[in-house]
A protein has these predicted regions:
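Sec-dependent signal peptide recognition
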Residues: 1-7
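Amphipathic alpha-helical binding modules
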Residues: 24-37, 109-149
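Short terminal alpha-helical segments
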Residues: 24-81
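Charged, low-complexity interaction regions
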Residues: 60-63, 86-88, 113
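Mature extracytoplasmic domains of secretory-pathway proteins
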Residues: 72-108
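C-terminal motif of bacterial Sec signal peptides marking the signal peptidase cleavage site
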Residues: 13-14
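Signal peptide cleavage region of secreted peptide precursors
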Residues: 17-21
Length: 149
């Protein structure tokens, strides 16, 4: 009887250790996913700003640094708001509002601020932030239905 009890105790401790190990592994994977997403968003923002500023320097841009700063103000507010959102419905409302604001600034610059590369970067920033919150699939474009860029 003691042997059976000892074996059961040993199995219980062994299984408990595996669950903790699996829990810890899953937690580490989730933390890494968030860290990688944030890093990617920051890298995309750096590339986006560089592209916009570099085009101003060519002298062909129909927008200025003030417009670039306004664009980034919109994007940064989006990232804060979506991070603090509590539901998918709220998150998608934030996406819609952000895209409409970006449409307006792009229209104000004669549709020159957000070109192909900028469009890709902005959409990816928004989509990754939504994905991080679980509002969309990683390859789903949640901006498409509202954007004019």
């Amino acid at each position: 009887m003691k042997a059976i009890l000892y074996i059961m105790l040993l199995i219980f401790v062994s299984c408990g250790g595996n669950n903790n190990s699996n829990f810890e592994k899953n937690r580490n994977e989730q933390t890494q996913k968030i860290t990688n997403t944030v890093k990617t968003i920051n890298e995309l923002k750096i590339d986006l700003r560089k592209s916009m500023i570099d085009y101003i320097k060519t002298g062909d841009a129909e927008y200025g640094e003030k417009d670039v700063n306004e664009c980034f103000f919109i994007i940064d507010n989006f990232l804060i708001d979506v991070k603090n959102s509590k539901s998918k419905k709220d998150g998608l409302s934030i996406v819609k509002n952000t895209v409409l604001q970006l449409n307006n600034i792009n229209k104000k610059t004669n549709f020159s601020l957000i070109e192909t590369m900028e469009r890709e970067n902005i959409a990816e920033i928004i989509n990754l932030a939504g994905y991080e919150k679980g509002y969309n699939a990683k390859d789903e474009d949640i901006t498409e239905q509202w954007r004019e860029w």
